[in-house]
Amino acid sequence: MGLSHSKTHLRVIKVAPLQNKEVETPSAGRVDFAFNQNLEEKTSYSLARLQDQNKALEGQLPPLQENWYGRYSTASRDMYFDIPLEHRETSIIKRHPPQRLQKLEPIDLPRVITSGRLLSQREARTMHKAKQVLEKKMQTPMYTSENRQYLHKMQVLEMIRKRQEAQMELKKSLHGEARINKQSPRDHKAKKTLQSTPRNDDHDLLTMLPDEILNRGPGNSKNTEFLKHQAVNNYCPWKIGKMETWLHEQEAQGQLLWDSSSSDSDEQGKDEKKPRALVRTRTERIPLFDEFFDQE
């Protein structure tokens, strides 16, 4: 970076003529050099000069600027030098100097290692490695023996568990077979009893009794015997059908016991009102499976 530098100079072209010829424009070749140290005189002079220029340029168009790209303009122009009042350095590098290189030193300096010390360190390292290898060799058989014992223990526990499961399955199968064997004779006995009992299609059995049976006179002992016999038969529902068939057969043949009775009893029965025939209904009770075996 150098102090000398080139600046582009601007050319001012006047466009409109002056309206008042008497007013003289300020000389273009006049150059102000502000070398006075007194700041007040400099500012007052610049303000008075600017006022004179404004009065002279009233009614004119603003000037056009043209770049000549490094060529000097023919007309002279005002120049102003920025001269600092204080005496100081103008160089940017001197104003902002770069940082100085700092020397970094380690805190712990390495010790000087001799050849004898290096050999002793190597020997100690090899001895330590050999000791570690020997310890590993001593630990490996102990570790394998522990593993072997653990595996053997797990195998024994697995065998015991399988044996217990097999015993439980065997017990379950034996219990099932015993139940089947107990139920088979019961089923056989039940089938025999069902086959031995007569089968009636209708569950409700109607017992039609003749009118003469209902005449419970004091002298009619035969009727009481028949009623007793009928009450006994009520406990055996499968015998009611046979009794009815026998009564119907006897009626058809006319050989009933009460037909051979005296004529006096017949006349008394005719005089009295004949009661309505009694119809008894009884549902057939089928014995259950458990009750059949409980009776034994």
Curated annotation (Swiss-Prot):
This is Factor associated with metabolism and energy. Residues 173-204, 256-281 are annotated as: Disordered. One of its GO terms (cellular component) is plasma membrane. It is a peripheral membrane protein. The keyword Lipoprotein applies. PANTHER family: COILED-COIL DOMAIN CONTAINING 198. May be involved in tuning the metabolism, energy expenditure, and excretion processes. InterPro entries: FAME. A lipid is attached at residue 2 (N-myristoyl glycine). Residues 173-187, 267-281 have a biased composition (Basic and acidic residues). The lineage of its organism: Eukaryota, Metazoa, Chordata, Craniata, Vertebrata. It comes from Homo sapiens (Human). Keywords: Cell membrane, Cytoplasmic vesicle, Lipoprotein, Membrane, Myristate. Pfam families: DUF4619. GO terms for biological process: energy homeostasis. It is found in: Cell membrane; Cytoplasmic vesicle.
